[in-house]
Amino acid sequence: MDEDEKDRAKRASRNKSEKKRRDQFNVLIKELSSMLPGNTRKMDKTTVLEKVIGFLQKHNEVSAQTEISEIQQDWKPSFLSNEEFTQLMLEALDGFIIAVTTGGSIIYVSDSITPLLGHLPCDVLDQNLLNFLPEQEHSEIYKMLSSCMLMTDSASSDCLKTDNELEFYCHLLRGSLNPKEFPTYEYIKFVGNFRSYSNVPNSTCNGFDEAVPRAYRASPGKQICFVATVRLATPQFLKEMCIVEEPLEEFTSRHSLEWKFLFLDHRAPPIIGYLPFEVLGTSGYDYYHIDDLELLARCHEHLMQFGKGKSCCYRFLTKGQQWIWLQTHYYITYHQWNSKPEFIVCTHMVVSYADVRVERRQEMGLEEVSSEVVSSALKDSGSSLDPEQHFNALDIGASILSASRTPSVSSRSSPKSSHTPKSDPASTPTKLTAEASTPLQRTSSTQQDLSAHRLSQPTALQASLPSQPSCELLPQQLLPQATLQSQPAPLAQFSAQFSMFQTIKDQLEQRTRILQANIRWQQEELQKIQEQLCLVQDSSVQMFLQQPAVSLSFSNIQQPEPQPLQQRPGVISQQQLVLSPQLPGQIASPQTPSQQVLREASVISSQGPKAERSTELTTGSSRPTRSTATLFGPSTSLSRRGPGPSSGPGASAAGCSHDQQLRLLLSQPIQPMMPTSCNARHPSDLSMAGSQAKYSQNQQMFQSLEVQTSSSGSPIVLMGQAVLNQGFATTPPSQSSSLPPMQLQHQQHQQQRYLQVQTPSSLHNEQTDSLLLSSYSPQQGNMGYHQTQQQQQQQQLPRRSNSLSESSNLPQPLR
């Protein structure tokens, strides 16, 4: 029994110790589980131990890397870490660290850029450095950044190994709370080296594409960047404390009604740096920024009227000569016996610069700066259709791109209160204030000036003007990149995305309007060209109607006996004159200068009320045609008739052949009817298939030249053409008036004979070979001309004849 009791006691003691050990182990596991991140579910002991082991391994790796990169020189205090020492050095040097790719994209910037230039790091990242530089410095900075990239692989690797320090000065844009303010640039100094980097995501380079071409870019595993320390050329004694390590820090104070310090909380010295006895009795306005004094005065008046309220965000000068952003809730306390105001109780809360900027821009109606000045300038010039003005708008937008496209703005330092020794950075000579770039104004007269300028150009030039597609120039320059601002609230991120999409939509709509306007302009220009062509054709028709018509009439003629026509065998003309009988009241229509008639090399013949007449000039043709009498005046037209029949009451007699009719007409003298001068045509050669230019030149020479008639009274025959004056009038013989229509149709199928006339050279040499026409009274000829001139001008109806070029296909006559 005793042994059993001893065993039970030992077992109970052992179980109790085991339970205690297990409980202690479970407590430790729970502590480890609570320290692990992301433990949303209950984990077993094995999982907790695995995660703890992984964390310890990573921690050891990081510690080893930190020890390797730790500064071991004596000039760094041992009690400061690398981050702390770097921050202190940057504050002492008035500088910040920046890493820029060879294309200009900013991949890293330190937080110290905010107190120096007023830009938040989130606003500068993924931007192009050229966005923050003046236009005149773009090319020079680009060459410096891409100098290492344009080398060969071996040269670039040697450049990274050696001491490749690069140092240059430039102007960098300052940030501002109000993006509509004129841009101000700070003169800074870059000192850095080219380094290789990896595991950095590719940036979007808002505002600029990568400046280095793809052929010169390094492979993804060997990327080069420029790491530099940026310093202000002129030291800035007053900086803004924009980065708040512990937000929502606050302290209290009491002020008199004149806003003098009466009390200061113990929490104030770590924030503002002043001890209570240092500020008691001093006015609170001595510590405020000069740009915020007006707003604070309004808040003070509001407080005196209503007894409580909340101030705007303002800058308070700390003991370390830095500006810290505060916001104050205040109220007035009254005396408990007489209810008179005693003092003002204030609760000051520290706010960050990012929150201040969001609040200020919301007050100004600018939640995000997604629409730049370039976009507004292009929208203002949307009504302009002139491609030159469109290019000017793009050039102006590119010139102000560095000043207006960046969304990162901040408030620059300004003159401070007079009780502290300060220097105003805004008034330093190293600042470069950009000129005011006014947006393009919309002009209503641009379209009118454009139309007037284009209408003044020749029609041929307008027809040959190619349309200038502005859409080819727009994709890279018309669409500014909208920037997403990193904000703590998801609502702000959504508003930024919505603003970006709205901006892109506006840009696309603007491009659509420009394309539609360009299409309308092209349609208007085409319509104007068609109207001008119609005007030219109408003017040619009016000129044709206004020219005087020639009436050729033959009357009171006695038919003589047929005379044989003597021809010289040795002189044979190369061109033949084909004559046809005419009736009184018939005219010859002038040659129209229309372009279509000239292109077709055709001529116009007129039709009278009783009969139709056509004259034909053939060169080397043996095709049988109807014999017609060709009479040339200053406005006589040349036409070629087809093989179709032509009927009229004045046809020739049945028993009389064509050869006899010609001899009857040419056997009589015409000296009484011949004027002193006539218009002659003096070309060297006339072909029935000649070109348009030669034909038009011959027509002008035919109307301009004048020659004197010979003493023998024979008509002037030039190159086979009989030239007569307007006053010359003839009629066919009386026997030809009795020819019936059926015989006229039969007569067309008879064999035609061509009357060969001499060239001008043979006419001048021998008078015996000249052709003689029937003589008529000049009074009768003139009377017939004047009687029928007015009638023929009203009855003149031009018709198009066949092309003269068809005669080239005719067989050659026998010589």
Swiss-Prot record:
Domain PAC, first and last residues per copy: 311-354
Tissue-specificity statement: Expressed in the retinal photoreceptor cells (at protein level). Expressed in the pineal gland and retina.
Cofactor(s) of this protein: heme
Composition-biased stretches (Basic and acidic residues): 1-10
Sufficient for heterodimer formation with BMAL1, E-box binding and for the effect of NADPH: annotated segments: 1-61
Subcellular location: Nucleus
Domain bHLH per the UniProt entry, residue ranges: 9-59
Keyword terms: Activator, Biological rhythms, DNA-binding, Heme, Iron, Metal-binding, Nucleus, Repeat, Transcription, Transcription regulation
GO terms under biological process: circadian regulation of gene expression; DNA damage response; positive regulation of DNA repair; positive regulation of DNA-templated transcription; regulation of transcription by RNA polymerase II; response to redox state
Residue numbers binding heme b: 119, 171
SMART domains (alphabetical): HLH, PAC, PAS
GO cellular component: CLOCK-BMAL transcription complex; cytoplasm; nucleus
Induction: Exhibits a circadian rhythm in the retina with peak levels in early subjective night. No circadian rhythm pattern in the pineal gland.
Regulation acting on activity, per entry: Carbon monoxide (CO) and the redox state of the cell can modulate the transcriptional activity of the NPAS2-BMAL1 heterodimer. NADH and NADPH enhance the DNA-binding activity of the heterodimer whereas CO binds the heme group in NPAS2 and inhibits the DNA-binding activity of the heterodimer.
Function: Transcriptional activator which forms a core component of the circadian clock. The circadian clock, an internal time-keeping system, regulates various physiological processes through the generation of approximately 24 hour circadian rhythms in gene expression, which are translated into rhythms in metabolism and behavior. It is derived from the Latin roots 'circa' (about) and 'diem' (day) and acts as an important regulator of a wide array of physiological functions including metabolism, sleep, body temperature, blood pressure, endocrine, immune, cardiovascular, and renal function.
Quaternary structure and interacting proteins, as annotated: Component of the circadian clock oscillator which includes the CRY proteins, CLOCK or NPAS2, BMAL1 or BMAL2, CSNK1D and/or CSNK1E, TIMELESS and the PER proteins. Efficient DNA binding requires dimerization with another bHLH protein. Forms a heterodimer with BMAL1 and this heterodimerization is required for E-box-dependent transactivation.
Name this polypeptide is given: Neuronal PAS domain-containing protein 2
Organism (species): Gallus gallus
Gene encoding the protein: NPAS2
